[in-house]
Amino acid sequence: MKVLVLNAGSSSQKSCLYDLPHTQLPQEPPQPLWEAQIDWPHGGDGAKLKIKTVHHRHEKTLQGGSRSEDSARMLETLYSGETRVIADPSEIEMVGHRVVHGGEAYRESTRITPEVKAAIDQLARFAPVHNPANLAGIEALEALLGPQVPQIAVFDTAFHSRLPAAAYVYPGPYEWLDQGIRRYGFHGISHRYCAERAAQILGRDLAQLRLITCHLGNGCSLAAVQGGFSIDTTMGFTPLEGLMMGSRSGSVDPGILIHLMRQADYTVDKLDHILNQASGLEGVSGISNDLRPLFKAIDEGNARAKLALDIYIHRLRAGIGAMAVSLGGLDALIFTAGVGENAAPVRAGACEALGFLGVALDPQKNNGRPRDADIAAADSAVRVLVIHTQEDWAIARECWQHLRR
């Protein structure tokens, strides 16, 4: 069966086509037949389209079109031109969508109906950047394939839906909870995939493991996983809470924001921009939200770049410690996403302070470009894994499982 996965974001859109057997899922993530990505630059200079198949790679700039038109042109490459992998869109049997916010109602993936679309739209007040883009992708595929092709919403918040009340209720007025103001958590598709993959690598029952998954990309979050579910996480009501990130501040004293509004006439929109787009690694270093140029600047003696990295690692260590306390112990620590998978100094810096938990790295393994591998020292009481997160495959797998229900 052919399953199309769409991951629609605010500034990019990713898509994959998988060909899966009807009888049994493969143990290892298969190579997609077709992969595509559109990036929309802030300056509006034309969308960058990249297509990859087993036999071809294709890149071009799309000029003059709307986002919906760009998306349609991306999907056309599935069944036309040199990147064609199917004869007709009717070969697609199911579509899976990443939907960022499912609120309290959606604790697992669900088939998309008019009611589900209305709920995604209504929840856009909590995710104003992402949920509208997710909904636009759903409607674009419905227009292309027709309403008879099942579409599945896989929610980023669902993995955290079993948080205990002590973890998700904020210590403000209780009435906030009635307004939907609570911790939701994000990156759930990635956290769940990495937890399940860790159990597979370790040859252990996931239900018996205490895990901390560290999703470190431009956005960063931790999850404490016990019994196969998230019981604590660092992101909150929005993806702004928690760890220091690429351009997001993570948690800061709310009194700072009150001070800036009173004493410096900061508007809500200005604070929103600063906290989400001009803070984190970029804000402290003044260089970039990407660690690679920061490492280069540190080597050249740049003190602000060094400070940015020091804060990043300090807050990562503190977050891991907090998650370990929520778990009451730790069996494995997992690093994933762009920074987690590729930045050996970050992994080393985090683990250096975790000896009291029994964490010990093997430096050679850590520096050896590990992928889906254990990089802990032989005598480490806690396993340390680097796992390549595969959210698209996780979504395709959810679609396959829906057909079996």
From Swiss-Prot:
EC identifiers of the protein: 2.7.2.1
Catalytic reactions on record: acetate + ATP = acetyl phosphate + ADP
GO terms for MF: acetate kinase activity; ATP binding; magnesium ion binding
Record: residues binding ATP: K14, H215, L216, G217, N218, G219, D290, L291, R292, G338, V339, G340, E341, N342
CDD domains: ASKHA_NBD_AcK_PK (cd24010)
Pathway membership, UniProt: Metabolic intermediate biosynthesis; acetyl-CoA biosynthesis; acetyl-CoA from acetate: step 1/2
Cofactor-binding details, from the entry: Mg(2+). Can also accept Mn(2+).
Residues the entry annotates as binding Mg(2+): N7, E391
Site (Transition state stabilizer): H187, R248
Active site, per annotation: D156
Chain positions recorded as substrate binding sites: R98
Gene Ontology BP terms: acetate metabolic process; acetyl-CoA biosynthetic process
Cofactor(s) needed by this chain: Mg(2+); Mn(2+)
InterPro entries: Ac/propionate_kinase, Aliphatic_acid_kin_short-chain, Aliphatic_acid_kinase_CS, ATPase_NBD
UniProtKB keywords: ATP-binding, Cytoplasm, Kinase, Magnesium, Metal-binding, Nucleotide-binding, Transferase
Compartments where located: Cytoplasm
Stretches assigned to coiled coil: none
HAMAP family: Acetate_kinase
Family of the protein in this entry: Belongs to the acetokinase family.
PANTHER family found in the cross-reference section: ACETATE KINASE, ACETATE KINASE-RELATED
Protein name: Acetate kinase
Name of the encoding gene: ackA
